[in-house]
């Protein structure tokens, strides 16, 4: 996953993308990152990015990030899913696949 800085977060141009938010010393975040790496390979039409929220306080506040790990899924410039529970690779795959191909929004 490509690491983005805070100033880049509002300028992503992909139609469908997932933004993974983490902190480096979070053990659960490390596991979630490995899961997303697998899912990324299975969903080539979805762009995957990551951001260390320690360096993005304005973004975290604007999107009301409550904890990490967290993912935000965007489609057509709008957030369509926010998740804190990563469950499993199959859960993430199905959720991202369904949300990225449907017209549903939060």
Swiss-Prot record:
Signal peptide: none annotated. It holds the Pfam family Thioredoxin. Residues 1-101 form the Thioredoxin domain. GO terms for cellular component: cytoplasm; cytosol. Keywords: Disulfide bond, Redox-active center. GO terms for biological process: cell redox homeostasis. It comes from the Bacteria. One of its GO terms (molecular function) is protein-disulfide reductase activity. InterPro entries: Thioredoxin-like_sf, Thioredoxin_domain. Disulfide bonds join 26-29. The keyword Disulfide bond applies. This is Thioredoxin-like protein YusE. The gene is yusE.
């Amino acid at each position: 996953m490509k690491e983005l800085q805070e100033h880049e977060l509002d300028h992503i141009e992909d139609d469908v993308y997932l933004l993974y938010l983490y902190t480096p010393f979070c053990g659960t975040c490390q596991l979630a990152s490995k899961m997303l790496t697998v899912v990324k390979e299975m969903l080539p039409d979805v762009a995957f990015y990551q951001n260390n929220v320690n360096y993005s306080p304005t973004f975290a506040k604007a999107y009301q990030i409550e904890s990490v790990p967290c993912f935000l899924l965007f489609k057509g410039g709008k957030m369509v899913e926010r998740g804190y529970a990563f469950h499993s690779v199959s859960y993430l795959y199905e959720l991202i696949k369904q949300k990225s191909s449907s017209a549903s929004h939060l």
